[in-house]
């Protein structure tokens, strides 16, 4: 076993040859490399599969022996400073490695077909493999310096992949927004790392935790400074995991290809923030204010993400806000000290959300046969509906993922979310009420997405091809009426557009974003020359990963069932995490009896079913297929209470549709303020600084020209003036000093 761990350092570097060879091939042999481009997809899947097998083998050994392995190479620079590099294999590392590789393999297989018609096929697989390398390097790092290096590489890869179709200005601005927002958190992370090195003198996790705990125990640290450094460390996780208030980049990250959305939201970028907090939890737990801050940020994000998902029309943006809310649950669990529950939900959510995103990609792919390549139309749930008849396999798997996120047993997220909800009652009743209420909202907005997409009729057939509504035959709206109430508020923004950080101009979607081999409609307007009247199911290479992730969604929750009775240990996850749990909670007991579990589960499942019922009432075709739901409303007497209720609903709708006005607030005050400051400094530089230097030159030029014209160019005149000046000088000298 020791020999196996010795070779674990190679894990991050196994996928690295793919981007290196693709880059070299495109430079040296571009034609041959492009001709055999699908070979690189096979190589990417093969190398990542090797990492997966190695990670599973290490995980089995850890479950059986509860071991942790760390190896460090020390580079001694001088007697006072040495730089250490190494790798750490513990339960957290093995869990993250399996998540990254399993989800990554499914995404790569899926992408082979999804990106088959794209000219950037090779570039896409190069980025994906480098993304896997960066994330694997991050989770195997044994110190904060390595964490930061791979942390920045993960951010770089996400920037490249979100802006993969960089010719579309919307995508270019989205990747810039993600990059700039994450720079805020990364700067805090760097300052926090330097602060804790100044306190402890070490970057290594094991030494850092031991030294810091001793300093806290002996009361030898400045608690204000320690708290500040911990907040700065946490800021990096807030930005990476899209927690409030640095969450604004996440929905705009949907401008990248859909497989990237699946990878970012399941196993890579957003998981990095949760991983960092979990890795540093032994540090944070001895600082009570930080643990409370983590839980507060988590519960705010839980509720905010759920409310923002309520009125989204873009299917990927709706799932993005769902990810934000679920990450809030994980952060809440970590803030409460529920280490096991947080990692359990990280595992179950990763597979469920990857399933949903790949399913949405299959839906978008099928919608493009009708509306052409236009994300504003192919991702618009208002143009979908009735797809259950056309994409039945996608429908079944998407329903599995939806039910899992809703918390319906026996699917994966039911087991993990229920643990977090139960732990929240012990931590804070207020937090518990918010968390349980948000569970109902989750069921509502997830079934809203499902019903708008798969039930009813294909809504695109009930629209004019100029994009305007016909007389509504099939009308669905969030609040049971046709149309959207427009808000004239100063901060209202168009939800179909990104918030532009670095550009004043807002551009339409570029028509040349992706080259397709089959014909498609123009993007500016619908045309009557449709390729196909109805969507069709995706190819097998796209359905296979969806099917596998569906199996994970069905069965992965079984690893964390917390029932240990009569010598039967069903809780594999607790045994797997035993070294970490014993470090954090030496006397913890994760077992639970059936009666207690069923009592808690009945409440959570009832709340989930209530949310599903409300969504079904508003969006099920039996209620929404009338010509206009206002027909029903006309029979209801609109008294003062009803008018007030409508105002409340419209306010919630505007809040959700306009992203809680947070993006608009940042754009107006932060971006506008920075741009105003830049314009002022530009004016000051041009008019004042340059004016002073240029003014001296102009004055010198004018004086010189004046003297030149006075002299006239004659030597006799120069001699006359010279003698006159000397005479005047001598006369003045005589008058002043003669006495």
Swiss-Prot record:
Keyword Glycoprotein found: no
Catalysis performed (reactions): a plastoquinone + NADH + (n+1) H(+)(in) = a plastoquinol + NAD(+) + n H(+)(out); a plastoquinone + NADPH + (n+1) H(+)(in) = a plastoquinol + NADP(+) + n H(+)(out)
Keyword Transmembrane carried by entry: yes
Transmembrane regions listed in the UniProt entry: 9-29, 40-60, 89-109, 125-145, 147-167, 185-205, 219-239, 258-278, 286-306, 327-347, 354-374, 396-416, 425-445, 543-563, 602-622, 717-737
Topology of this chain in the membrane: Multi-pass membrane protein
GO biological process: one example: ATP synthesis coupled electron transport
GO cellular component, one term: chloroplast thylakoid membrane
Record-listed E.C. numbers: 7.1.1.-
Subcellular location: Plastid, Chloroplast thylakoid membrane
A Pfam cross-reference name: Proton_antipo_C
Keywords recorded for this protein, A-Z: Chloroplast, Membrane, NAD, NADP, Plastid, Plastoquinone, Quinone, Thylakoid, Translocase, Transmembrane, Transmembrane helix, Transport
GO molecular function, one term: NADH dehydrogenase (ubiquinone) activity
NCBIfam families from the UniProt entry: NDH_I_L, PRK06590.1
Functional summary from the UniProt entry: NDH shuttles electrons from NAD(P)H:plastoquinone, via FMN and iron-sulfur (Fe-S) centers, to quinones in the photosynthetic chain and possibly in a chloroplast respiratory chain. The immediate electron acceptor for the enzyme in this species is believed to be plastoquinone. Couples the redox reaction to proton translocation, and thus conserves the redox energy in a proton gradient.
UniProt record similarity statement: Belongs to the complex I subunit 5 family.
Summary of subunit composition and partner proteins: NDH is composed of at least 16 different subunits, 5 of which are encoded in the nucleus.
Name of the protein this chain belongs to: NAD(P)H-quinone oxidoreductase subunit 5, chloroplastic
């Amino acid at each position: 076993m020791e020999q196996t761990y010795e070779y674990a350092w190679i894990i991050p570097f196994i996928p690295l040859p793919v981007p290196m060879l693709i880059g070299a091939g495109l430079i040296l042999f571009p034609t041959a490399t492009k001709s055999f481009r699908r070979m690189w997809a096979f190589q990417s899947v093969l190398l990542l599969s090797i990492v997966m097998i190695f990670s599973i083998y290490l995980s089995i050994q850890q479950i059986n022996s509860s071991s942790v392995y760390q190896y460090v190479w020390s580079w001694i620079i001088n007697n006072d400073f040495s730089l250490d590099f190494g790798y750490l294999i513990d339960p957290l590392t093995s869990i993250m490695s399996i998540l990254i590789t399993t989800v990554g393999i499914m995404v790569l297989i899926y992408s082979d077909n999804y990106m088959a018609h794209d000219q950037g096929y090779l570039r896409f697989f190069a980025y994906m493999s480098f993304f896997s390398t960066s994330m694997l390097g991050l989770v195997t790092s044994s110190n904060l310096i390595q964490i930061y290096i791979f942390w920045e590489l993960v951010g770089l890869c996400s920037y490249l992949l979100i802006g993969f179709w960089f010719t579309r200005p919307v995508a270019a601005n989205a990747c810039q927004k993600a990059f700039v927002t994450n720079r805020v958190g990364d700067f805090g992370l760097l300052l926090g790392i330097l602060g804790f090195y100044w306190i402890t003198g070490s970057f290594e996790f094991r030494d850092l935790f031991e030294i810091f705990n001793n300093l806290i125990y002996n009361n030898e640290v400045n608690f204000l400074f320690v708290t500040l450094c911990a907040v700065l460390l946490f800021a990096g996780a807030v930005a990476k995991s899209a927690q409030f208030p640095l969450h604004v980049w996440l929905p705009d990250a949907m401008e990248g290809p859909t497989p990237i959305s699946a990878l970012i939201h399941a196993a890579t970028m957003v998981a990095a923030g949760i991983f960092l907090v979990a890795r540093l939890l032994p540090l944070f737990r001895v600082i009570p204010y930080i643990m409370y801050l983590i839980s507060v940020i988590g519960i705010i994000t839980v509720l905010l993400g759920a409310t923002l998902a309520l009125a989204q029309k873009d299917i990927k943006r709706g799932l993005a806000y769902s990810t934000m809310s679920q990450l809030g649950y994980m952060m809440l669990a970590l803030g409460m000290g529920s280490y096991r529950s947080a990692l359990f939900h990280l595992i179950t959510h990763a597979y469920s959300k990857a399933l949903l995103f790949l399913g949405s990609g299959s839906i978008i792919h099928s919608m493009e046969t009708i509306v052409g390549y236009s994300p504003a139309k192919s991702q618009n749930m208002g143009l979908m509906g009735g797809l259950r008849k056309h994409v039945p396999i996608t429908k079944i798997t998407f329903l599995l993922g939806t039910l899992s996120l809703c918390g319906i047993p026996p699917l994966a997220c039911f087991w993990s979310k229920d643990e977090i909800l139960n732990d929240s009652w012990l931590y804070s009743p207020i937090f518990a009420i918010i968390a349980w209420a948000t569970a109902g909202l989750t069921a509502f907005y997830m079934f809203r997405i499902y019903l708008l997409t798969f039930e009813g009729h294909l809504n695109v057939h009930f629209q004019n091809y100029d994009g305007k509504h016909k007389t509504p035959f099939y009308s669905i709206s969030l609040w049971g009426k046709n149309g959207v109430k427009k808000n004239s508020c100063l901060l209202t923004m168009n939800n179909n557009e990104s918030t532009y950080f670095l550009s004043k101009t807002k551009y339409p979607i570029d028509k040349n974003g992706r080259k397709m081999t089959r014909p498609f409609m123009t993007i500016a307007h619908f045309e009557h020359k449709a390729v196909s009247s109805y969507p069709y199911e995706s190819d097998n290479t796209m359905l296979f990963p969806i099917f596998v992730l569906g199996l994970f969604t069905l069965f992965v929750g079984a690893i964390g069932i917390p029932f240990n009775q009569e010598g039967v240990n069903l809780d594999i996850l607790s045994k797997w995490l035993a070294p970490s749990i014993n470090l954090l909670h030496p006397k913890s007991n994760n077992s639970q009896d059936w009666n207690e579990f069923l009592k808690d589960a009945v409440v959570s499942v009832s709340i989930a079913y209530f949310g599903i019922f409300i969504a079904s009432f508003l969006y099920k075709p039996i209620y929404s297929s009338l010509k206009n739901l206002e027909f029903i409303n006309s029979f209801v007497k609109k008294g003062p209470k009803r008018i007030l209720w409508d105002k409340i609903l419209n306010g919630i709708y505007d809040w959700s549709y306009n992203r809680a006005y947070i993006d608009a607030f940042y754009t107006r005050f932060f971006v506008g303020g920075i741009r105003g400051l830049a314009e002022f400094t530009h004016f000051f530089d041009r008019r004042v600084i340059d004016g002073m230097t240029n003014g001296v030159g102009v004055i010198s030029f004018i004086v010189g020209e004046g003297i030149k014209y006075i002299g006239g160019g004659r030597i006799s005149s120069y001699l006359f003036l010279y003698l006159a000046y000397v005479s005047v000088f001598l006369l003045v000298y005589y008058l002043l000093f003669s006495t």
